Amino acid sequence: MYTVEACPCCQSKKSQGRWAIVAPFLAHYAVERPPSLCKLLECSVCSFRFFDARLTPEEVARLYSGYRGERYFAERHRWEFWYSRQVNDGIGGDPEEIALRVAALEKLFLPHVNNGKVKAVLDYGGDRGQFIPKSLGIDKFVFELSDAEPEPGVNRIGSEQELNSMKFDFIMALGVLEHCSEPASVLEQLRSCLNPGSLLCIAVPYERYGVGFAGKGRLYRSYLNALLHFPAALVAVDFYSAAARIRLNHIPPLGLVKCHEHLNFFNNTSMTILLERTGFEVVDSKIECVAKYPARVESLYILARLR
């Protein structure tokens, strides 16, 4: 892992930080070292939240190769006993959730897209390509780091080199940028793959849970350091914190914030600034409910066009 100080969206170095930990699962599975302290930062300029700890390309490859497969599930369940087989297998595979996400996507882009002009569609980081609306485009492609088998009618792009040689009329990146250590670099790559006048649709979780009980000072840092030396206590506090965050949308007293797969927490302002900085202009945006299990989940959808 490496650390950053500047906001990945607006590049400001003015921020407020709270102590957090690198999740035990992430530390052992991807980083291959014991969990450690990090910080959750909130940019004072654009209100973007992000962890200062970022994954290297090698760590990303370890995390997403065989994503949600047997080894992934076993290691994550070891450190997060509440992460069940039902949750693991249901992510991206629940027909109701897929329908909700596709409907949210169509609600955003249909008023702005001439389907007759959309030939090639890319779902970047799109698992099996199951979220590509059937009505959109003729040639459908998915670029995915995991080993997921594409849906019928969806063509898998096998490498960065192949992707960079192609052009598309519509690109989707749903549930991607929250995972990225360098989101601006990803958007710059996608910009180079778009035909002139084409559209990019971004969706990210809209996660703005309360962090008031996560401390900034030495006392809270010492508390987290003590937890790191007692794995059973760390797992217990992690469970307590996750339950409060999911049910109450707040980190509880003596709870903790952990750096997990989501490194970034966008709102409309920060996403707009990031898109404009990387050569896009925002066309439309919406916040939509996209899942109801194990709790209500909202996503921020933004449609952007090349400037």
Question: For each predicted feature, which ranges?
Answer:
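Conserved N-terminal segment of class I S-adenosyl-L-methionine
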Residues: 1-174, 185-187, 286-290, 295-303, ...
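Acidic-residue sensor for enzyme active/binding pockets
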Residues: 144, 178, 261
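S-adenosyl-L-methionine-dependent methyltransferase catalytic module, highlighting the catalytic core
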Residues: 181-195, 199-307
